[in-house]
């Protein structure tokens, strides 16, 4: 009986004794580095050129295709990878050396941690007395425009854009003879914190 079962199993499995690895055991490629705008995912599109032109004009995930009712594995993994990048942007702090390199000193809202910043948005709109005092001592009073930087929900966006954006903005204001205040960085800041900043420094626009 045992021999019959063994033969039956061999017939069903086709006598397979070893299984080849499904993927190369080498380094797994970083899916987040793939340019989705240049990737043609739809099989046999009616107009491949226009499809790629449309994808090049938007960051939306167009034409990801499917396997039955589900996303393809590569599409799903790319979505998870992008989600991980977004999570890192939220939970990672802007490095102090980056602030120093861009001439920004740091103050903090009434939030004491990233968790509190995410769960208590009201505290991210408020400055404590020590922060207000620091701003008044380090910043120009009553400027026409007060420019400051804040992490909000993406430290990555700060690092990617501020080195180009901040100097251009300050130069543009100066060229129009608009007085700008001393730039600085607000950690754990919500949009409403600008009202507190304007009140502390007496700026016309923040």
What are these regions (language model features)?
Residues 19, 176-183:
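Flexible, glycine/charged-enriched surface loops at secondary-structure junctions
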């Amino acid at each position: 009986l045992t021999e019959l079962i063994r033969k039956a199993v061999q017939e069903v499995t086709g006598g397979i004794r070893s299984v080849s690895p499904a993927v190369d055991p080498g380094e797994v490629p970083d899916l987040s580095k793939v340019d989705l705008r240049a990737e043609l995912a739809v099989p046999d599109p009616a107009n491949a050129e226009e499809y790629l032109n449309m994808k090049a004009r938007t960051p939306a995930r167009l034409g990801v295709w499917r396997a039955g009712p589900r996303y393809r594995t590569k599409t799903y993994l790319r979505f998870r990878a992008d989600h991980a990048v977004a999570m890192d942007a939220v939970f990672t702090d802007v490095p102090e050396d980056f602030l120093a390199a861009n001439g920004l000193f740091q103050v903090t809202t009434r939030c004491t941690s990233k968790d509190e910043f995410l769960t208590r948005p009201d505290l991210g709109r408020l400055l404590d007395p020590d922060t207000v005092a620091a701003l008044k001592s380090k910043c120009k009073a009553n400027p026409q425009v007060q420019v400051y930087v804040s992490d909000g929900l993406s430290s990555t966006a700060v690092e990617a854009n501020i080195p180009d954006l901040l100097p251009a903005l300050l130069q543009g204001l100066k060229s129009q003879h608009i007085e700008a205040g001393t730039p600085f960085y607000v950690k754990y800041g919500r949009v409403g914190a600008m009202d507190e900043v304007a009140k502390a420094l007496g700026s016309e626009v923040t």
